[in-house]
Amino acid sequence: ELIDLDLPTFIDRVLALFAERAQRKGLLLHSQIAEDVPTALCGDPTRLQQVLSNLLANAIKFSDRGTVSLTVDLDQRPPEQRLEFPTTSYSESSSNTTRISYVRFSVADNGIGIAPSAFAKLFQPFVQADGSTTRKYGGTGLGLAICKQLVDLMGGHIGAESEPGSGSIFRFTVPLQQQAEKERPAA
């Protein structure tokens, strides 16, 4: 379902859910929205919040120092390079006058990182990068698989970069409609 979304307010609300948890661990929680990102969008805030909440919870869980940051920018690649987006998504069912922005959300941390050998299974159910992390950090191993399903349902793509001991960056890009300009009453 497409719902009007004020991006800065939405981001602030999501981060507020994790402020206390980050503070208890001595982590700085930071966000930045690039200037060229439209702030009045239409999308599925429930699914967006579920994905961001899982990524932020993981970033805080697996970090003992530093900063957890949420960055929002536009995917500037030309359309032919965005082939990972499904050909049928809610964005394509709208009228030709609807403007779509490919908005990329990135969650970065200074946590334990992920070994390259674990990437192939990272978004599969019941998988954590290392069995010992399940014992130390807990969790079901379902979070990233659910994130992938939700991002897929929104017509997007999710991925990650990481290096053991150097933290991780999880990114997902989804097509979001720009809200139509509201008519101003004549003076």
Give each language-model segment a name.
Residues 1-6, 23, 28-39, 75:
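Conserved catalytic submotifs in the C-terminal HATPase_c
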Residues 7, 113-121:
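Short helix N-cap motif at coil->helix boundaries in the Bergerat
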Residues 9-24:
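Short alpha-helical segment within the cytosolic histidine kinase core of two-component systems
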Residues 20, 112-113:
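Glycine-rich G1-box
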Residues 59-60:
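Short helix-loop "hinge" at the ATP-lid/N-box region of the Bergerat-fold HATPase_c
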Residues 132, 155-161:
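Glycine-rich ATP-binding loops of the HATPase_c
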Residues 138, 143, 147:
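Short alpha-helical Gxxx[C/S/T] motif in the catalytic ATP-binding
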